[in-house]
Structures are given as C-alpha cells and as structure tokens.
C-alpha cells in the first residue's frame, strides 16, 4: 500500500473516533442538522476504517508467519499462512481503493424518474406501465416512498408519459444508470397473428435538486401557465384551472403537473421537476465530458443511447453497455434489479480505478 494512502486511512480512523465521541456527547442532538451530518459521516467512515483495521491485522498475521519460517517444523504451515494472507491482503487493498473512490455527491439524493413511450404506439405505452411497475416494486424492496408527480395515460391503460418521485436512501446511486432507451420485444396483447413487435421507451433519472445550492431559478425567467387538468382527479379538478405548466425561458425547458389536488400543489411539484431537469442537464454535460475523457461505457447519461433490451419470448434481458445477459426477465420485471444495478456499479468502479491508475 502506498504511504500516502496509509496516511489518509489513518486520518480517517482518527476522524471516526472523533465523530463517535461527538455523537455520544450529551449536546449532540441540540442541533439536529449537525447531528444528521455526523450520523451520515459515521456511516460512511465505519466501513473504511473497519476494512483498514482488517488490512493491518492481516499484515500483522503475515509478519508473524514470516517469523516462523526459520523453524523447520513450522515452515510448511508458515508458507501456507503467508500465501493465504497475501491473497487476503490483495483483496482488502482492492476493497480499500474502492472505498476511497470519490463519492458522487448526488448518490444519497431522492430522484425524479421519467418514463416516456417512444416508437410502438399503444404497445410502447403499455411497456411504459410495465417499467413503472418494475421500478415501483424495486422501490418497495428498498423501502423507498413512491409519489406520482405527473401522468399521461393511454387508451389501453398504459402511459404516454409518467413522472414519479422516489424518496429514500441511495435512490440516485442505485438507479442513475437507468437513463436511456429501453427496448422491448414481445407479442402485443392487440396482436392477432402472434407476431413479435419491437417497441421502445425512454427513461430519465434526475437527482432532486437542492433548490438553494444547486439551481437558482429567477422568477423573471419563468412563464407559468394554468390549464384544465385531464384524467385522474375527479370533477373538481376538471372544472378549475388547477394544472400548471412552467417554462424556463432561457433554456426552453418545460415542466407541468396536474395530478395534485390544487393549483398550489401542482405549481410546487412542477417547480421541483423543473429544477431537477435543469440540474440534470448540468450534470449530463459534466458527465459526458468526463465519460469521453475516460472512454466510459456507462454513466454518460445519453438519453438517445439504447441501453437495454427486454425479450419476452426468450425470457431474456440484455444490458448492452456491459454485455450482460440474464435469463430471468420475470424476476427483473417484478423489481428484482439488484443483479443489474450491482453489475453497473461494479463496472463504473472498475473504470474509476483504471482512471486512477493512469
């Protein structure tokens, strides 16, 4: 291990001890914001320090085994211990490198998840509903809260477009690689000849913006229109101009909401979505530049890129960015996304580690 990395890890161990002491203080909960920050820092530092402790213990075990090499009776045992210890040390070193990789500041944020039906008409809209169910079930597995912000339903019960807010720890970190084109191959319910059709949807995952720190919206740059809501909401909504559309004039970005029970609620939701869209554009520009610099296959956030194919006749799902194919489509569509998300996160970590080595 490099001396600079060992010194950094020793500093983190000292900091964990300090944070633990602060959290145990009688005055710790007097400032709840500071208490929450310390709790988060403690949770982030603990796995790093524990792994570093295991690394140092392993180094000590190897040194003890090397001392036994001079004893003829213990030599064979010592050699086996050293070989096993070095393998373990290498694995711990790699784990520490991953733990020390720069954290995405958005990883712990809530997200807005937007699904738009693309080519394929009614079948694409039905697939959009299937994707929404998949992400909703995944959110439930993670005990995240799901809120529908805006929905435009199709005639057959699908969605032309739907936006949901997912609230929960690590929502962005787990789903940020879902942005892009999702293609489905299956026999539609409306198909009488049994032919397989190909349809597509576009998914956009946007981190919820911190309105104060990350996106400043000048009221002079906004055009706010109200109109009659359609669809869900009942007669009351249809009789009043409760739906809200907000346009950010400098960029032309639009956000609208009509699913709330009042114009005030819809305006607040539309402002949140607008801020998230503007923040998302800023992030994508930054990510695309960084991805191009390290020739990244994932994480660029290119919405036009086809990232995944769902083949129903074969029960197959393929992620084209990492050439991963799973024959467990039913499980994935029921929200079992862990294998996919874990593989994508691992690929990004490998890319970042390779970049550090350059």
Swiss-Prot record:
- Give all N5-methylglutamine modified positions: 235
Q: Which UniProt keywords apply?
A: Cytoplasm, Methylation, Protein biosynthesis
Q: Name one Pfam family in it.
A: RF-1
Which is an annotated GO molecular function term of this record?
translation release factor activity, codon specific
> Where, per UniProt, does this protein localize?
Cytoplasm
Q: Which domain of life is it from?
A: Bacteria
Post-translational modification, briefly? Answer: Methylated by PrmC. Methylation increases the termination efficiency of RF1.
Keyword check for Chaperone, yes or no.
no
Briefly, what is this protein's role?
Answer: Peptide chain release factor 1 directs the termination of translation in response to the peptide chain termination codons UAG and UAA.
Q: Which family does it belong to?
A: Belongs to the prokaryotic/mitochondrial release factor family.
For this entry, the protein name equals: Peptide chain release factor 1
Species name for this entry?
Chromobacterium violaceum (strain ATCC 12472 / DSM 30191 / JCM 1249 / CCUG 213 / NBRC 12614 / NCIMB 9131 / NCTC 9757 / MK)
């Amino acid at each position: 291990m490099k001396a600079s990395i060992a010194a950094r890890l020793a500093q983190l161990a000292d900091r964990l001890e300090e944070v633990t002491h602060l959290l145990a203080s009688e005055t710790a909960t007097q400032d709840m914001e500071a208490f929450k920050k310390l709790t988060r820092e403690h949770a982030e530092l603990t796995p790093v320090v524990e792994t570093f402790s295991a690394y140092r213990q392993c180094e000590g075990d190897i040194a003890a085994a090397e001392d036994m090499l001079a004893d003829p009776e213990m030599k064979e045992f010592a050699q086996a211990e050293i070989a096993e210890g070095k393998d373990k040390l290498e694995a711990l070193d790699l784990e520490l490198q991953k733990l020390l990789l720069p954290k995405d500041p958005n990883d712990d944020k809530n997200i807005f998840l937007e699904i738009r039906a693309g080519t394929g008409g009614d079948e694409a809209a039905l697939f959009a509903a299937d994707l929404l169910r998949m992400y909703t079930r995944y959110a439930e597995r993670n005990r995240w809260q799901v809120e529908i912000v805006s929905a435009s339903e199709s005639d057959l019960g699908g969605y032309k477009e739907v936006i949901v807010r997912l609230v929960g720890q690590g929502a962005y970190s787990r789903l940020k690689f879902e942005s892009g084109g999702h293609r489905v191959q299956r026999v539609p319910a409306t198909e009488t000849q049994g032919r397989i059709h190909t349809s597509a949807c576009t998914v956009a995952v946007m981190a919820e913006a911190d309105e104060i720190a990350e996106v400043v919206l000048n009221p002079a740059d906004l055009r706010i229109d109200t109109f009659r809501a359609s669809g869900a909401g009942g007669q009351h909504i249809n009789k009043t101009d409760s739906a809200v559309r907000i346009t950010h004039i400098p960029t032309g970005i639009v956000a609208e909401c009509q699913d709330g029970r009042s114009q005030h609620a819809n305006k607040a939701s539309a402002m949140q979505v607008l801020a998230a869209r503007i923040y998302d554009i800023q992030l994508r520009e930054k990510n695309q530049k960084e991805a191009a610099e390290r020739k990244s296959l994932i994480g660029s956030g290119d919405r036009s890129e086809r990232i995944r194919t769902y083949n129903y006749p074969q029960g197959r799902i393929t992620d084209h960015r990492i050439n991963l194919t799973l024959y467990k489509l039913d499980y994935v569509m029921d929200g079992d996304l862990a294998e996919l998300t874990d593989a994508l996160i691992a690929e990004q970590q490998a890319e970042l580690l390779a970049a550090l080595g350059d």
